[in-house]
Amino acid sequence: GHPFAAVRQQAANLYATKMAEAGFVALSFDQMFWGESGGTPRGAVLPDLYVESFSAGVDYLGTRPFIDREKIGVIGICGSGGFAIAATKIDPRIKALATVSMYDMGEYFRTGLNRTRTAETRNKDLQTAAEQRYTAFESGTPVYGPGQNDAVFPEAAESNDFYQTERGKVASNDRRTTPASYAKFINFYPFNDMDSISPRPILFVVGEVA
């Protein structure tokens, strides 16, 4: 699975290619509402459906005649690490899980980068999101905020070294979403009950300069 607010060309395809070169059958995909996958509004944040995308991938792979259903695993990169964990908790067909530079999007939107987000700020953002739902409903048009590439996001300065340069930029993806849907992340807790995945193996890949 590709990073949040990315598309499959941004990291996921590379990982799939490397896995294929190692002899595995690999599938990369665009999350619902992103890239070439369907769904409106574009760029919507719906963690439960992001989780479902992993199980949908298992549906597809597990019905190919050349696939061993007992050897299907998932890889989640950055934000997709959390979605991959959540999928593995509830889908026993996933026999192994790996995450790379996993980022807990739920925790980020609850407490901010390095826990700098206050309850007051969070509640203010939830109120703004609620008001934007009325606006979108009455106008029939989604309300978009700044994209993940914009400086309003503290991590943008580092992530733009990839997403806004030749090696990582995809012209069709401005990484914008609807602030109203960000509220869905507040209720996303992928680490809860993670021990239920056992005895299936889990690999967390981390790095100091990821």
Task: List each model region and its residues.
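Active-site nucleophile elbow and catalytic-triad environment of alpha/beta-hydrolase enzymes
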Residues: R176-M194, E208-A210
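Alpha/beta-hydrolase-fold enzymes
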Residues: I85-T165
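The serine-hydrolase catalytic nucleophile loop
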Residues: A5-T17, Q31
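Short beta-strand/loop motif that positions the catalytic acidic residue
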Residues: I197-S198, F204-V206
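Alpha/beta-hydrolase fold nucleophile elbow
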Residues: P65-C78
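Alpha/beta-hydrolase active-site loop
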Residues: A11, A44-P65
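Conserved alpha/beta-hydrolase
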Residues: K18-G38
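Active-site glycine-rich loops that stabilize anionic/oxyanionic intermediates
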Residues: H2-V7, C78
